Structure formats: C-alpha cells, structure tokens
Amino acid sequence: MSKQRTNRSSSRLAAVQALYEYGFGEKTIDQIAREFMNGDIGAEVIEETDDFGTEEFVPVMPAEPTLFSGILASYAENAGHINEMIKASLAADWTEDRVEKTLKAILQAGVAELLAFPETPVAVVLKEYVDLTSCFYEGAEIRVVNGMLSNIAKALQSA
C-alpha cells in the first residue's frame, strides 16, 4: 500500500475494512463506523518494507466522513440488493461462498458507492476499487473486480 492515498481513497479503504469487519457479524455497521471515525480502528495499515516480507505499521490519511459514511449507509440500506447484484455477476461456475471475504468487501463497497454517489464518474469508482484490490491481491482478483463492478455499473445505469 505504498501508493500515496487521498482522503477519498482512504475513505474507500476504510469502507472496505469496515465491511470486512461487518462480515464477521459481531458489530453493527454503526458501531464499526464510529470506531473508524474516532480513529479507534483503521488509522494504520501494514505495509511490506522490503522483498523479505518485513512489515511495519503505516498511518493512513483520515477518511473523508461524507464518502465513508455514505458508502456504509448505502450498504446498510441496500445490503440485500447489493449482495444479489454481486451474486448475479459471478461467473457461472462460482458460488457466493467461493468469494473470499476481502474480495467480497471490496465489491460491496464499490457497489454501495455506485448506488450512493451516482454523480461520481464510473471510471473513477472502477479505478479506485481496482487500485484497492491490487493492494490486497496480485492475480485474477484485480480483473474480477474490474469486470464485475463494470457490469454492475452498466446495469445500474440502464435501470
């Protein structure tokens, strides 16, 4: 995660982290959002510092409250619809259970943002979530996020 992040990018990262945590079912979205906004969680990320796997904690720019809260509120309000859109976009040989939790949180945040902020250009949303995905994965997941969010965005625009 060595790329310089903006407050809006940090908001998206925080939303992904919050939805990942929400996926464990131990806290409400409101509880998790408060913890992020208070800086109790999500203020740092682990970054590899060399080719040997050495890691250190690196501070993250604070999230922009409007974007972060908007993504989480959109997910809370539309969770069933968002998860159905993600499920419908999966390849025929994939099931929802096969989608790893981090990847699912990235997709959930991306779709929630597309719903909550239709004025944000789709290309910006796609680039941001593809960039986020590349912080966690190096393989096909990057193409999966790009393709699925692109297809969902097209479906939302035509609805």
Task: Please tell me what each predicted stretch does.
Residues 1-159:
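N-terminal interaction/assembly modules
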